[in-house]
Amino acid sequence: MNDIKELGTILSIWAHPDDEAYLCGGIMAMASAAQSRVVCVTATRGELGVTDPTRWPPEQLLTIREAELAECLRILGVTEHRWLGYPDGGCDSIDADAAIEQIAGIVRDVAPDTILTFPPDGQTGHPDHIAVHRWSVEAVRRTGIGTLHVFANTQEWLDDQLARWTELGAIVGEPPIAWAGPLSIDLTLTGQVLDIKYAALAAQASQTEAVRAVVGEQAYRELIRIERFAAFAPQQAPVSQAMT
C-alpha cells in the first residue's frame, strides 16, 4: 500500500473500546484526514475493564468507556460508529449466527472496500477478540463484500515487543503468533499521525493511563507505532458451526 486512499471505504470491527485505537488508530486517522469514509464497529462497551475501581467505579465504567471512545474517535477524525451491544466477556457464549448477521447487515449497509479486524488468535488471546474475528470472517464470506485484513505480527515485532506487552498484562491467553505470509498494510507511525494515535489512546484513560505511567511516554509510543495487517480470505465453507 503506497497511499492510504487505496484502502477506499474502511470498516473496522473490534471487541472493546481501545482495540480500534491500538490496532488501527493510525490507519483510521490517516484515512479520515484523506477524506475517506471510515466506520468503526465495537461489539461491547468494555464494562469489565476495571483498572482502578476508586477512580473509575465499576458501576459507572460502561458510561465512562462510552464517553472515552467517543472522544477517541473524535481525535482520530472518525464520525461513524456502531455498537453491537454485547456483554463484555460474553462474546463467545452468545448466538454466533445472530452476531454474524448483525455484522453482515453493517457490511451490506456500508459496502466497505477494506475490512479490518483481529487475527484468528485474537492478538491478545481474549475470547471476545477471537469471537469477533470469527464473526467478521463469516460475515464477509456471506456478503462477498470488501477485502478482509487481519492484524498481523511479524517475528521481528514479537521478538522486540511481546515480552513487554506480556509484562504489562495485555496478553490474557496464548501469546500471538507470527504471521507467515505477506503483509497488505505495513505502517510505522511517526510525527503527527503518531501524536494523534497517542492522544486517542490517552483519551481512553481508564484503560491506558496506568500503562503509560509505568512505561513512560516515549516507550509507549514505541509500543503503539506499528500497524500491520494481512489480507485474509474467508473460508468457502460456513464457519458458524465452530463458533457455537
Regions found by a protein language model. Give the residues of each.
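Active-site rim/loop-helix segments in enzyme catalytic domains that contact anionic ligands
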Residues: M1-A111, V137-R142
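Metal-dependent de-N-acetylase/amidase catalytic core
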Residues: N2-L11, G89, S93-T244
